[in-house]
Amino acid sequence: MAKVDIDIVDFEYIEEIIRNRYPELSITSVQDSKFWSIQIVIEGPLEDLTRFMANEYCDGMDSEDAEFYMGLIEQ
């Protein structure tokens, strides 16, 4: 099992993406942050979590930013 702790803006959208495209993953923690975002922890198999991060969360980011966020995945 792997996990990642990330900030998001639209919880409902991410929740729907995970439910429909990545059912192996689960959101295990949700906290409002004071900076107009929501901090969530997503857990699941490493391969699925890596695919979610690459295809959904990091999509459209500069390569340096994507590399940073991909590096947040913990095993």
UniProtKB/Swiss-Prot annotation:
It holds the Pfam family Phage_FRD3. This is Uncharacterized 8.8 kDa protein in frd-Gp32 intergenic region. It comes from the Viruses. It comes from Enterobacteria phage T4 (Bacteriophage T4).
